[in-house]
């Protein structure tokens, strides 16, 4: 992803054409994110589970051929050396924090292992920043964050990816296990988000030069917040129509945020910094996605497990522990129980999951609502240069 965005910045250095190209790129990124579960669900419904991984082979080969034939060659005048120490510190720091967030509901948030992982992640993050300051060829030159558009864009796209991927993670389980759709049917019901992204990305590419990242990103984050709020207030008896509204808002919001921030990041940098600037954009998306799944998944799991603790059932304690691992496991267990007992336990498990969606999706709504305020406060005005000063008066 960093290379593709950098290539667009080189081919379309400035102006409306670059913004439109980034709008198409953003739509492709977002649509691919949603189409992946759709295709995976269809494959699981018709073929061996390994086909979900094998499908990437022909796609990768096609991409390799297309890159060799179609992508123009471009490189920085001076190529830096690799920074293995920086790469290792960053990976282990992020992995430590994510592990702590994921394991918190199971091991306990105050357990020694979880607290140690949080502490290790914080210390390693500080060590990473210190190393980047003194390294001769740092992986992430910290000077690049002096560009206001890049710093704000990375922060906002991270928050957007947090909500986008975290919501998809929860929605797939909701569609399949609460609403009762097959994997293939679940994938199809993610389709409206992909279609909305396909329209929103190019549209944001038209709006961004006129309104600026501040307005377009704020509107996108507001739509993402609304999408999360719709799912946060969903009841177990609600059908797909309510989720459809959330999917449409999700696609529109993601398209606006990814396009506006990516365009601002590329437009704020000189050609020599396009590679590392694009890499920060990609890293922000990936970090936001991983954090969204970890945080929202942990909140969902915590409430779901607590909900099953309060359910009077004929399920033995050992089997109940297995049911707490996932709603899918609980429903499989319910099928083994006799008559009304199985039906009652399945309904209770579904209700516990929907109850867990409340805090999980509220986290997504809260993060993106904060993102709206940050966009209005931190994002540069329309016409801002790389340091955040304006070339023309903002009419908005």
PLM feature spans:
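Hydrophobic transmembrane architecture of multi-pass small-molecule transporters
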Residues: 62, 264, 280, 284-379, ...
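C-terminal membrane-cytosol helix-exit motif in multi-pass small-molecule transporters
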Residues: 58-75, 93-102, 121-135, 374-379
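Helix-loop-helix hairpins in multi-pass membrane proteins, especially solute transporters
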Residues: 1-85, 112, 195, 237, ...
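Interfacial helix-cap and linker-helix signal at transmembrane-aqueous boundaries
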Residues: 39-47, 101, 175-176, 207-208, ...
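Residue-level hotspots within transmembrane alpha-helices of multi-pass secondary transporters
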Residues: 3, 34, 38, 95, ...
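Transmembrane core module of solute transporters
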Residues: 48, 85, 110-117, 123-124, ...
